[in-house]
A protein has these predicted regions:
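Small-residue-rich transmembrane alpha-helical segments that form helix-helix packing/gating elements
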Residues: 1-34, 39-172
């Protein structure tokens, strides 16, 4: 194997790993702020993707407009779930909260399937499928964008957990 192929695979693998680290960062951020693992986090992410799809394809807005609108929508969905389902369980045994988040996961998946069906749907996110040429290396553009997003989220995570101001904000 020549060095350029090895470098290309190593960089694409590292960028792919950053995508997984975003998922882990979300799990850690929720656990650290609430001391409860949220078993419905994957279903909430899936619902957010379907909301983006509904806004982009249903209303016809561009993807970069649909994403912030879906984020706002999901903020209010999450706040509603917290107020209606999770807040009532504050101070209760952890198993009750885990069971509630598991039930929310099942409910969100079933509701999403009832609305949009069970087949996967293609969605263009506005990133070209053409590889990014970095000298002799070919990089996947979506991985590069993911790496930029991961770096931004790691900076936010660092701010909230390693700076005095972030720790004060978390305490509020």
């Amino acid at each position: 194997m020549d060095f350029s192929l090895f470098s290309e695979l190593a960089i694409n693998g590292a960028l792919s790993g950053l995508m997984y680290s975003l998922v882990a960062l979300g799990i850690v951020l929720i656990y650290k702020s609430s001391s409860v693992p949220n078993l419905a986090q994957g279903a909430m992410t899936m619902l957010g993707a379907y909301v983006v799809l509904a806004i982009a394809n249903g209303i016809g807005l561009p993807m970069w407009t649909a994403i912030p609108l879906a984020m706002g929508t999901m903020f209010f969905v999450g706040m509603g779930i917290e107020r209606v389902a999770l807040r009532r369980l504050a101070g209760r045994p952890i198993i009750m909260i885990l069971m509630m988040t598991l039930g929310l996961d099942i409910f969100i998946r079933a509701t999403t399937m009832a609305i949009w069906g069970s087949s996967s749907r293609p969605m263009s996110i506005g990133i070209s499928d053409e590889p990014l040429f970095l000298g002799p290396l070919l990089l996947n553009r979506s991985y590069v964008v993911g790496a930029v997003v991961a770096a931004a989220l790691f900076a936010i995570f660092f701010f909230f957990f390693r700076t005095r101001r972030g720790i004060v904000l978390r305490a509020i």
